[in-house]
Amino acid sequence: MARRLAGVCTLTALVACGEAGPTLAEREAAARAAQEAADQAMRQRTRAAREADRLAAAWRYQQATIGGGAQVTAAIFAAEDVDTDGHGARAVQLVFRDHEEWGRSAYLVLEAGDFACRPRCTVQVSADDREPQPLAAWRPETDEAIAMFIEGTAAFWRLTGDAARLTIAFPVTAGGTRTATFDVAGLDESKMPGW
């Protein structure tokens, strides 16, 4: 009996001193907090996966025979349309091309307006928050497409592959320069073998 009483007294003393552990309300609050943290982590993973899918879907890859040779392209539109001719914002596209006879090239395509880049010009290219880099460019003597080729294709490709966002400032015939920003993080480099 004395032993039993000593155990009860010890238990009572522990409870009275607050060493019995968290209360039911505290345990429930901790469980809710843990569940909220797990739910938040799941929402973040879902958002990240959705964003990765969006970025990957922004790129278009094509294989075709053009001009008698096999060609592979990776193309993406600017995140926002750009007013290149003073008549409203239109799409600007960035294309990487590998043609078995013409070689590798990178170029911009406008839906309206034109590049002020005949015979040559300089564009400013920046990756993410890095300082802009000047790259030589040129506009071919053709009216088949409104395209401007960017030189230093290999370096430009590497810059694109390392970036989440690529910003290109280019001159236009409407006057001044325009800037197009491309969300390039979803680039699948395996679609352009050998680059």
Please tell me what each predicted stretch does.
Residues 1-15:
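Sec-dependent bacterial lipoprotein signal peptides
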